[in-house]
């Protein structure tokens, strides 16, 4: 069975907005340099991942993924990562709870780290992710990757195109 994997942070959970609410500025602000970011303060927020807001179009993305699951026979899984060195000890549970509260029909699997996601890929599996390196490594092992950028609609359109093409192929069989 093929699988469609949805990343969480940056795809359905708005990590950037959640962190901005906590630290008082946006990490994507061009005037902020990463070495200046108070990572210790971010890591110390004990419920950061659990209380992240949804991305504005998260429900649309999830519903499209559900359509792929239901109509095309894919398995649907959240594939997320824990912070490196597991220095945010509650991230694992927070992410599980976040998904259960919002999308209880979708199981959560962990990379465990971001660069490990490709190990879950079987040729033809789909990954929807916001990190270009994850998308590239996914493609290198035979998967199909849809990258979410600031133009979220482009990712939705690309996933819809994949759905339509596969529907057309199935109709020929």
Spans of model-derived segments:
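Active-site neighborhood of HAD-like aspartate-dependent phosphohydrolases
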Residues: 1-46, 140
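Basic, glycine-rich
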Residues: 155-173
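Acidic, Mg2+-coordinating phosphoryl-transfer loop and its flanking beta/alpha structural elements
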Residues: 126-159
């Amino acid at each position: 069975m093929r699988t469609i994997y949805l990343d969480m942070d940056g795809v359905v959970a708005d990590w950037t907005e959640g962190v901005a609410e906590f630290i008082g500025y946006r990490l994507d602000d061009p005037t902020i340099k990463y070495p200046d970011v108070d990572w210790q303060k971010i890591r110390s927020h004990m419920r950061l991942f659990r209380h992240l807001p949804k991305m504005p179009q998260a429900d649309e993305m999830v519903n499209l993924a559900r359509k792929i699951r239901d109509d095309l026979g894919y398995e649907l899984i959240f594939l997320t990562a824990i912070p490196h060195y597991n220095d945010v000890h509650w991230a694992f549970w927070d992410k599980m709870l976040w998904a259960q509260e919002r999308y209880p029909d979708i199981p959560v699997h962990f990379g465990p780290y971001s660069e490990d996601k490709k190990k879950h890929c079987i040729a033809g599996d789909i990954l929807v992710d916001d990190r270009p390196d994850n998308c590239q490594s996914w493609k290198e092992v035979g998967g199909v990757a849809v990258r979410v950028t600031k133009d979220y609609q482009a990712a939705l359109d690309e996933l819809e195109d994949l759905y339509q093409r596969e529907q057309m192929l199935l109709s020929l069989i």
